[in-house]
Amino acid sequence: MKRMLINATQQEELRVALVDGQRLYDLDIESPGHEQKKANIYKGKITRIEPSLEAAFVDYGAERHGFLPLKEIAREYFPANYSAHGRPNIKDVLREGQEVIVQIDKEERGNKGAALTTFISLAGSYLVLMPNNPRAGGISRRIEGDDRTELKEALASLELPEGMGLIVRTAGVGKSAEALQWDLSFRLKHWEAIKKAAESRPAPFLIHQESNVIVRAFRDYLRQDIGEILIDNPKVLELARQHIAALGRPDFSSKIKLYTGEIPLFSHYQIESQIESAFQREVRLPSGGSIVIDSTEALTAIDINSARATRGGDIEETAFNTNLEAADEIARQLRLRDLGGLIVIDFIDMTPVRHQRAVENRLREAVRQDRARIQISHISRFGLLEMSRQRLSPSLGESSHHVCPRCSGTGTVRDNESLSLSILRLIEEEALKENTQEVHAIVPVPIASYLLNEKRSAVNAIETRQDGVRCVIVPNDQMETPHYHVLRVRKGEETPTLSYMLPKLHEEAMALPSEEEFAERKRPEQPALATFAMPDVPPAPTPAEPAAPVVAPAPKAAPATPAAPAQPGLLSRFFGALKALFSGGEETKPTEQPAPKAEAKPERQQDRRKPRQNNRRDRNERRDTRSERTEGSDNREENRRNRRQAQQQTAETRESRQQAEVTEKARTADEQQAPRRERSRRRNDDKRQAQQEAKALNVEEQSVQETEQEERVRPVQPRRKQRQLNQKVRYEQSVAEEAVVAPVVEETVAAEPIVQEAPAPRTELVKVPLPVVAQTAPEQQEENNADNRDNGGMPRRSRRSPRHLRVSGQRRRRYRDERYPTQSPMPLTVACASPELASGKVWIRYPIVRPQDVQVEEQREQEEVHVQPMVTEVPVAAAIEPVVSAPVVEEVAGVVEAPVQVAEPQPEVVETTHPEVIAAAVTEQPQVITESDVAVAQEVAEQAEPVVEPQEETADIEEVVETAEVVVAEPEVVAQPAAPVVAEVAAEVETVAAVEPEVTVEHNHATAPMTRAPAPEYVPEAPRHSDWQRPTFAFEGKGAAGGHTATHHASAAPARPQPVE
């Protein structure tokens, strides 16, 4: 009769044995420190994806991450819009940080982590549920005949949810459809609880732990052929009755009995010796032969020896009978030891093929009762049989053994003499190294005795050959023969320590493996779900949901606290100045700053988990630092603007209406248009503020505070590139407008004068042009030049081209960079001093540079030359009204900074600035400036002078004077009223014309004649003629080559060797 014996007398080890009479055929041992992890369900997080392995590594709570192959990933973890074309790519399926529910398919072995799967399987008494694998399912392969047909009909009547698979176990044979449906409903309830628990906590943690050894034994081994279940512990007996009832096997409750005999349970049935055989390498056979089982990293090798076997009439019969016995014992040992993987059996050689087939059939019949899947091949011509067995759990040796600290698992150690000679060679090798003072050898006692006695002369020879090197050999009784340490001590590192104290000194370097780490037992992790106490109501999740209502009102409360009404007086004056100046023009939107920021912050916090927002946040952070870096320059610019703003009294009545409109627009504006709206607002704000009149000095401090408040509440939006906020307004004006310039009026200000350091003093000579568009300010040119310099001298691109159109553009850009270099290969200073350049033998080729860039560089040089220590800012009262007039075809005076002689005792350098830069472009045709042209310019100025009408009586507009080309540089220049300046400049131009007969001015172009460097007159050297003549070649010979033309021949007849007598 078959029995199940459960030994629980020792709490450190629980053993379950299945016996048939007194023959042990299955064994399961579990220790508290070696619980089985296979079939445990975890919630893990993907930490790394390896496309080369087509797998992902998952952190599920263990020290070593699990291995999740691509084929073990369920379809439910694929992206919603994923469409597989051929072989799927794991990077398209999974992403790092994704949380998955995994089950351990193979436990950790050696250096390999656990193999995981997302196809969960929940094993019950009669059924195995595959909740996310619809392709899996069927009936156990052991069930055959009519039982299989009945189970198919029962399966058809079960209510299985869509997308799930079901397997009927062997224990389900003969069960009714109601019993199968009850087990199925239990598994479905279990799966729902697993999903609920997975949603309650973040990964990684253990959701479901596989049952202990008793429950597994009841679930896997309880069959109708089990006659009784004997347990030697009353507490375990009560626990077993509960498990039987929970598993739905009430028919076995009567078979559970308590063993109360004096003899231990396993000894009573004489299976202790059989259990011990499962831990031994060699197992004896009844006939006298033996089998030897060796487990390696790759496979398990089993060798069969006849040994003392004498059964049989001849050697062939003896080999055949021994192999038959070995086949039965091998099948039994595989179950007892739970060996899995590849197994190779070396049977005793058998000549007849029928004997080989008989042994194969005996082995197949012996493993039929094994739960694991087994595949067996035929015996090869070398007498080897290959088979594979499913690894259900760690083998008996892996769960109860550890690697030997002495032999490191090899089973052998090196001989003392061989090890001593190896240490001696290593000592000499260390002594040969440079800067070696001592060599310390810490060795076991037998090795030290051999080196200090038998090999004393060899040690002395090493010290003699290596002058100054001292060999110290120290015996250590804590060491065993395979281990030793040879340490090299450099000069200056030696310590005055006694030799027998060296092992303690080098204790860290030796670091012998301790056995304490094997004795450590980790505290088992508690699962989130109880195994058998399955509640009808899923477990309540962790208190994460109540936090949602607290977070939700946060974005709604943000817009309710506008930042604009904080200082109504400042904003009213600011809006009043803008409204009064433009009189109902385009409305400004400075109060949009606080509203978008109040809404953007909660929005960005909500999008923290979106991976596509990471780059945008990075750009915002970079922009924050850039704005802080340029805060000082922005404040200075704002101060200059605010001084030019006029205080208006009529704006206070419009404050409430504008505030309501701006707030409404800010709330209803789309978030996608926030960056564009911010950029347009800044450009409009800069243009308008550039035209504002100067504010009174009593409100200057308040304006500075308002500017700082505006900078603080300005929303941070991603921009392509930070732009300089000094853009000027461009207008088209007629000849009369540009020619009219009011006289310069110096105003005395009661307050302390403000000294500006940035711009240098500039003077402008007004020209009479055709109707043209005004030139931009030097600041704008510098900005454009800076942008061009950033882009390698080329215009900045507004956007990035599509990826599929980018290759040819890159090729053109590379060709352009190579064809037109931005730097000269030879420095200009060296070229000017070179006589070869002056004589025309060497030419430097430069890239095409716009004339505007050349003029800007010349202006910079002029500004550097004319910098003076004292600079006084004098506002110029001049108002210009647009006048539309017909084109006037007159010559245009070039903008020239010339010395102006003033008969005053103390000349001063006066800087005049104007927000509108009026610099007329010259005509395209180069023309010569004459006196008549200057007179015409004066007449036009006089005729256009009465047209001037000031827009506002209190408006003080400063004139920005632009410099162009330096003719004569003087240390001091004073700006005078417009009309006299024109006349004096004309005279100056006459004097210049006396030196240079013709001065041509081209459109946006500046030239200068080439100045020859002082060098002696170049006289080319006459070519040299040589008198050498090629000698005539006289050929002597027959005019042919080869053996047939030879004149001398030598030959030798073949000689026969002399015979040896």
Swiss-Prot record:
Its main location: cytoplasm. Residues 536-546 have a biased composition (Pro residues). Residues 39-119 form the S1 motif domain. The N-terminal S1 motif binds RNA, and can also bind single-stranded DNA (in vitro). The C-terminal region interacts with the other degradosomal components. It is a peripheral membrane protein. Residues 404-407 are annotated as: Required for zinc-mediated homotetramerization and catalytic activity. Residues 1021-1061 are annotated as: Interaction with PNPase. Residues 532-565, 586-731, 752-822, 1031-1061 are annotated as: Disordered. InterPro entries: NA-bd_OB-fold, PNPase_C, RNA-bd_AU-1/RNase_E/G, RNase_E, RNase_E/G, RNase_E_G_thioredoxin-like, S1_domain. Gene3D superfamilies: Nucleic acid-binding proteins, Ribonuclease E, catalytic domain. This is Ribonuclease E. Its EC number is 3.1.26.12. In K12 strains that are derived from W1485 (including MG1655 and W3110) the rph gene has a frameshift that leads to loss of its ribonuclease PH activity. In strain K12 / MG1655(Seq)* the wild-type Rph protein has been restored. It catalyses: Endonucleolytic cleavage of single-stranded RNA in A- and U-rich regions. It is found in: Cytoplasm; Cell inner membrane. The gene is rne. Residues 598-608, 615-640, 652-690 have a biased composition (Basic and acidic residues). Endoribonuclease that plays a central role in RNA processing and decay. Required for the maturation of 5S and 16S rRNAs and the majority of tRNAs. Also involved in the degradation of most mRNAs. Can also process other RNA species, such as RNAI, a molecule that controls the replication of ColE1 plasmid, and the cell division inhibitor DicF-RNA. It initiates the decay of RNAs by cutting them internally near their 5'-end. It is able to remove poly(A) tails by an endonucleolytic process. Keywords: Cell inner membrane, Cell membrane, Cytoplasm, Endonuclease, Hydrolase, Magnesium, Membrane, Metal-binding, Nuclease, RNA-binding, rRNA processing, rRNA-binding, tRNA processing, tRNA-binding, Zinc. Residues 547-565, 1043-1055 have a biased composition (Low complexity). Belongs to the RNase E/G family. RNase E subfamily. Residues 169-170 are annotated as: Interaction with RNA 5'-terminal monophosphate.
